[in-house]
From Swiss-Prot:
The gene is rpsP. PANTHER family: 30S RIBOSOMAL PROTEIN S16, SMALL RIBOSOMAL SUBUNIT PROTEIN BS16M. Belongs to the bacterial ribosomal protein bS16 family. GO terms for biological process: translation. This is Small ribosomal subunit protein bS16. Gene3D superfamilies: 3.30.1320.10.
Length: 111
């Protein structure tokens, strides 16, 4: 069973709130999950300590069992001070390298 550490959306319309969950890779985004390991509230200021709250010990456990974090969650995990496995870091680097640059707002408007 492939396991991912990802965001599950909650909250109201136009007021997002996310749970950081460990879930089966084939499960729906907001569906069943194995364990809740944190929260993310994008409505709070970026310097607020409660914007991202993670259970570091449980995340380390799931990473050791082979769970793969999504790109956004991997950034949160690194900022929290948890060391990601080398395999995950390599995958993130490859995805970042292959990503197309976004056009600026001016260029998009003109096109």
């Amino acid at each position: 069973m492939a396991v991912k550490i990802r965001l599950a959306r909650g909250g109201a319309k136009k007021r997002p709130f996310y749970r950081v969950v460990v879930a089966n890779a084939t499960a729906p985004r907001d569906g069943d999950f194995l364990e809740k390991v944190g929260t993310y509230n994008p409505m709070l200021a970026s310097d607020n300590s409660e914007r991202v709250v993670l259970k570091k010990d449980r995340i380390e456990y799931w990473l050791s069992t082979g769970a793969k974090p999504t790109e956004r969650v991997a950034k949160f995990i690194e900022q929290a001070g948890v060391i990601l496995p080398e395999k995950v870091k390599k995958e993130m680097a490859v995805k970042a390298k292959n990503r197309k640059p976004r056009p600026s707002k001016k260029e998009a408007k003109e096109a």
